[in-house]
Amino acid sequence: LTWLSCVPLLALGQAPLLVSGILEAMNTGAPATTREQLSELATALAWTIPTALLAVGYPLVRNLGTALARLALVVPTRRQLALGLAVAVALVVLMDPLTLLISLVWNWLGWPVSPAESVERLFARNLNPVGAVVMGITAGLSEELLCRGVLQPRLGLLLPNLFFTALHAYQYNFDGLLTVFILGLAFGVLRTRANTSVCALVHGLYDFLVVMITILE
């Protein structure tokens, strides 16, 4: 059912949110203010955190402590913090040439790639330092809680990562989804080696660094 989100991508030949008319309609307003960005962050966390807790049985079969333990949402150690920082930086360095390679293969095959300018315009309202922090926290914590915290312990590495990838089908073409899938595999492997907190840290730092690099360019 998750892959139903890919139906518009298949029908249109490109990610729905990158279609020119939709993209222009979404970018008619001024850049988001700090207050608006913080409100978006609060809204996202206000539903994802309770949803994750409910999904693992809180408060019916687990108390808060055991629910957080089931989600592997714990306070990371200093070593884990250092590991998270190192992995996030490594992913930023490695994913750039990998994304380029995927684009070259897609172009060679004659398949549509995710246009970089359109993707940048999609996130234009939040392309500032505060927006980078908000996107990092929102995506990092929300997506990792649901995919690596709730689903992976029950369903293993692959199925939750397919769900994670499908969540991005409205904003990327299939070349971008392959990149997301590879990133998700990295987060999933990290979850087996550490915990969801470290996954959220790495995911959030990765998104933050990518946005900041885009701003500086």
Enumerate the language-model features and the residues they cover.
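Transmembrane helix-loop-helix hairpins at the membrane interface
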Residues: 89-217
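Juxtamembrane helix-loop-helix connectors linking adjacent transmembrane helices
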Residues: 2, 13-48, 56-138
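Loop-to-transmembrane boundary segments
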Residues: 1-9
